[in-house]
Amino acid sequence: MGKVLIIDDEKQLLRLLSRMIGLEGYTVYEAESCKAGLKLLALRRPEVVLCDVRLPDGSGVEFVKDIKKLYPCTEVVLLTAYGNISDGVLAIKNGAFDYITKGDDNPKIIPLIAKAMDSAVRLYNEKNCQLTDEGKHYTFEGIVGNSPAIQDAISLAKKVSQTDVPVL
């Protein structure tokens, strides 16, 4: 059906939303901060992000700009416990698909995820979205090998990766 990333620092609500959305057939990923969310965005490439407005390491309203810059076809729905109209307006201006109040009893969440998913799929098809150069994150995790030669190669690659020098 599609992939949804939920970013919320309230663990209980995060698990509840994850279960609820997962039961609808979506693959769900969880993060508790903007930083962890960005890592999962790069690794899993979800079509929809459901993000809390207030996170320990940043504002969800501002985080929308970062997400849309790196992943323009990913739709972002912001969750808030505070129905602040000015935050909602700013979120939409920053590129959010929608802005909704938190609560496990909010019957609008699942239909809203479905709408956001449809929109994201449409955007991916229309724009043939690709990652921007800024969105490409490469790591050295997962490289198998502990020999001194491999460790030297990884060390050198890490040093060179911080520069703009072409490497063959």
Which stretches of residues belong to each language-model region?
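Active-site beta3 strand of CheY-like receiver
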Residues: 44-50, 55, 77
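The feature encodes the CheY-like receiver
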Residues: 14, 56, 84
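Acidic catalytic/metal-coordinating carboxylates
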Residues: 32-36, 59-62
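Two-component/phosphorelay signaling modules centered on CheY-like receiver
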Residues: 11-29
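Short amphipathic alpha-helix used as the core "switch/output" element in two-component signaling
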Residues: 39, 54, 61-72, 90
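AAA+ ATPase active-site-proximal loops
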Residues: 132-168
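Active-site residues of response regulator receiver
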Residues: 8, 52, 80
